[in-house]
């Protein structure tokens, strides 16, 4: 029997970030709705052509989204909060749900599992669902008519969709009965339209599962697939399926897709427990998350073992390709060849699947490949420092209460001190100067002069707004990780390696190919210049080791712990130099602290062990008079508040404005006695919040948090916002702080 290939999650942004440009042009009234949708359809067809031409057999559809695929499902099933009903245009309503408007707060946005992709959390009010728009059918028809190809529509399954809404299990069970008819109607319509195969993504199946969840899933798919002629495949990824035997042998579907790269236990389960003889095994053998070339020898060995269990195998990627840039070819001449030859992005994954298929079906020889060797980029001094770390001795002294008193006496800050997270708006002019400098159109001297002028502007604006602790604005930084990766040894920066983070926001994850170390200052010059302009304290701001690691592509030959420690030691040198040069507040941003948390509970303690140590390693040797801040993005804060406390940062700011109720509930059960700033407004939306809105958040916060420890700040950096809305929002934030201080007089 000849095996086939399929893929899923191909990047939707376009090879030249066409989606980003079209979205931002539409939001800025530069193009019409018709033009935006024409771009979308063009990208859908273009992506399908790329997959088709690579030799992949089963081509996916319904994977394109104008903003987020979970939001697409909310709109498709009419899970639209009532506050958005006043917007009559469906497309504008869709974007308002994602981004908010001046009058309407956006839906919450959070990380998708343990990735750096953000999704829009469903906000389910009515508990009534209806199939309003059949987007999967529309895209199936578009590709059928354009390319004469029958595609495999991809949808998110009901279990994962409801779990993504962050509901308790009682509500998930109740809503599953309500949403099932809408899903059923969708599948019936696809079946009637000639769809032969459908992929239903249920990555929530890799989480730890209770017995009632297993029963719910079994019942859902029994009803969902009843009477259908199309083949239903359940796709899982990011980890091994939980309750393998109970689910895989009982769910009424045609096949299962398993991650055999990050879910090693899947392979063990198949080999020891077997696989249903009447189902297809979709083997995820090429990685959707890391950029390293597939080792064909290892994969062929694994497939030989799988063929002893079942001959019904289809080859695929392990997880959505959306986490990879589009092609390595776009980096030729930019990244050195010996590093480039180690890499494989989305298009190369398609090629790898075809190579494997031909080797199995036709006996074609596998191409000769040198093994990936990171050791040639090693540094003995770095290895020596890592081996001498005493993890039990990484502690700050004295205790927090004494340190904080010393710091606040020295800094002379008022009650409810105000600050921002770090970045200020990066205008077109800022981006142009940076591009001109990188392309050799202006000199380093001209570029630095411009950056220093922007720093002067930012400091002046902050002083005029009467903000207490200032920042330099980060105008020299393209991205909070890329900036440090460019300056540290051991990282490669791509030129076109864009990956979608959310909506129109794209990032370029650096590639860690060797040992990491610091051979020059990273932030000192800009920070000292800003401090020279003002008597107010200016924060030195750096991205922490865990976030740099999590938002990069790590090497695979050593542990993530060791990579994080290498980065932490490099950052520690920078922290101590900033302190030596007179900077009194240093912020180590760790927005991805929780993001890399293993999905299985039994693997989480080990993760927290090295992530906490990485932060402490960066900060433990500073003076007690130096105040250490950290910033984190919200994601299930309640579950990890004790781990965040263990970082022993003097002040933490949290991205919490879209989920403030959930954040505050954490403090009802945990006495957090360090400094804390809960973001008082949402920077992901262009709306300017009122003073009253912010005061309400502060009041709720200080009912649970000691007011002497409470800081007031936005919930994230301001890089993506415009100056007008930034100044207006910060003005209201300072007014809110002053109003709170007056009450305490």
Curated annotation (Swiss-Prot):
Broadest EC class assigned to this enzyme: transferase
Reaction(s) the record says it catalyses: 5-methyltetrahydropteroyltri-L-glutamate + L-homocysteine = tetrahydropteroyltri-L-glutamate + L-methionine
Transmembrane helix as UniProt keyword: no
Source domain of life: Bacteria
A biological process term (GO) from this entry: methylation
Binding site for 5-methyltetrahydropteroyltri-L-glutamate: 17-20, 111, 505-506, 551, 595
Binding positions (L-homocysteine): 421-423, 474, 589
Keywords carried by this UniProt record: Amino-acid biosynthesis, Metal-binding, Methionine biosynthesis, Methyltransferase, Repeat, Transferase, Zinc
Binding annotation for Zn(2+): 631, 633, 655, 716
Active-site residues annotated for this sequence: 684
Residues binding L-methionine, per UniProt: 421-423, 474, 589
PANTHER family: 5-METHYLTETRAHYDROPTEROYLTRIGLUTAMATE--HOMOCYSTEINE METHYLTRANSFERASE (PTHR30519)
Function: Catalyzes the transfer of a methyl group from 5-methyltetrahydrofolate to homocysteine resulting in methionine formation.
Official protein name in the record: 5-methyltetrahydropteroyltriglutamate--homocysteine methyltransferase
UniProt organism field: Thermodesulfovibrio yellowstonii (strain ATCC 51303 / DSM 11347 / YP87)
Gene that produces this protein: metE
């Amino acid at each position: 029997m000849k095996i086939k290939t399929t893929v899923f999650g191909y990047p939707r942004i376009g090879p030249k970030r066409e989606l980003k440009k079209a979205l931002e042009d539409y939001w800025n009234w530069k193009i019409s709705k018709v033009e935006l949708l024409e771009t979308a359809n063009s990208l859908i067809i273009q992506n399908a052509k790329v997959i088709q031409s690579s030799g992949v057999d089963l081509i996916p559809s319904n994977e394109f989204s104008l903003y987020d695929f979970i939001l697409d499902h909310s709109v498709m099933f009419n899970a639209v909060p009532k506050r958005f009903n006043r917007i009559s245009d469906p497309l504008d309503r869709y974007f308002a749900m994602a981004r908010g408007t001046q009058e309407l707060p956006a839906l919450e946005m959070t990380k998708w599992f343990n990735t750096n992709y953000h999704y829009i959390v469903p906000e389910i009010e009515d508990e009534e669902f209806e199939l309003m728009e059949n987007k999967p059918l529309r895209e199936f028809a578009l590709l059928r008519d354009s390319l004469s190809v029958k595609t495999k529509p991809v949808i998110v399954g009901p279990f994962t969709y409801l779990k993504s809404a962050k509901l308790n299990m009682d509500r998930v069970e109740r809503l599953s009965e309500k949403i099932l008819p809408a899903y059923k109607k969708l599948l019936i319509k696809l079946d009637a339209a000639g769809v032969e195969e459908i992929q239903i993504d249920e990555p929530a199946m890799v989480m730890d599962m209770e017995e009632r969840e297993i029963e719910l899933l079994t019942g859902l798919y029994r009803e969902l697939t009843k009477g259908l002629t199309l083949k239903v495949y359940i796709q899982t990824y990011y980890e091994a399926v939980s309750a393998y035997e109970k689910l895989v042998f009982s769910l009424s579907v045609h096949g299962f897709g398993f991650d055999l790269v990050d879910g090693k236990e899947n392979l063990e389960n198949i080999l020891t427990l077997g696989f249903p003889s009447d189902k297809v095994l979709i083997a995820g053998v090429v990685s959707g998350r890391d950029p390293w070339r597939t080792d064909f020898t290892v994969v062929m060995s694994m497939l030989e073992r799988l063929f002893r269990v079942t001959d019904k195998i289809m080859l695929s990627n392990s997880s959505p390709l959306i986490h990879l840039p589009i092609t390595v070819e776009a980096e030729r001449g930019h990244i050195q060849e010996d590093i480039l030859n180690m890499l494989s992005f989305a298009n190369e994954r398609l090629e790898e699947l075809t190579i494997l298929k031909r080797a199995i079906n036709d006996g074609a020889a596998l191409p000769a490949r040198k093994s990936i060797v990171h050791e040639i980029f090693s540094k003995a001094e770095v290895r020596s420092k890592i081996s001498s770390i005493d993890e039990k001795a990484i502690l700050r002294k004295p205790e927090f209460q004494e340190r904080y008193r010393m710091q606040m006496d020295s800094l002379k800050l008022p009650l409810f001190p105000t600050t921002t997270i770090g970045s200020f708006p990066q205008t077109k002019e800022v981006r142009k100067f940076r591009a001109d400098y990188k392309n050799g159109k202006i000199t380093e001297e001209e570029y630095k002069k411009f950056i220093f002028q922007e720093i002067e502007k930012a400091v002046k604006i902050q002083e005029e707004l009467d903000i207490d602790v200032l920042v330099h604005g980060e105008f020299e930084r393209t991205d909070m990780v890329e900036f440090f990766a460019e300056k540290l040894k051991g990282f490669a920066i791509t030129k076109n390696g864009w990956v979608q983070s959310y909506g129109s926001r794209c990032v370029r994850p650096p590639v860690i190919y060797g040992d990491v170390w610091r051979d020059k200052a990273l932030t000192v010059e800009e920070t000292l210049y800003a401090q020279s302009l003002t008597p107010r304290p200016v924060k030195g701001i750096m991205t922490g080791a865990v976030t740099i690691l999590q938002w990069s592509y790590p090497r695979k030959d050593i542990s993530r712990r060791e990579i994080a420690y290498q980065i932490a030691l490099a950052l520690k040198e920078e922290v101590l130099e900033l302190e030596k040069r007179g900077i009194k507040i240093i912020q180590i941003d760790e927005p991805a602290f929780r993001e890399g948390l293993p999905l299985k509970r039994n693997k989480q303690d080990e993760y927290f062990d090295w992530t906490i140590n990485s932060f402490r390693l960066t900060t433990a040797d500073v003076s007690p008079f130096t105040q250490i801040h950290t910033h984190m993005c919200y994601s299930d804060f309640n579950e990890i508040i004790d781990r965040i406390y263990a970082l022993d940062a003097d002040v933490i700011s949290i991205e919490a404005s879209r989920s403030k109720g959930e954040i505050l509930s954490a403090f009802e059960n945990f006495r957090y006695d360090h400094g804390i700033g809960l973001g008082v407004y949402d920077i992901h939306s262009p709306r300017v919040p009122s003073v009253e809105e912010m005061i309400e958040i502060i009041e709720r916060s200080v009912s649970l948090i000691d007011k002497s420890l409470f800081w007031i700040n936005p919930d994230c950096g301001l890089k993506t916002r415009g100056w007008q809305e930034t100044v207006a929002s910060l003005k209201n934030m300072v007014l809110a702080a002053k109003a709170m201080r007056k009450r305490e007089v």
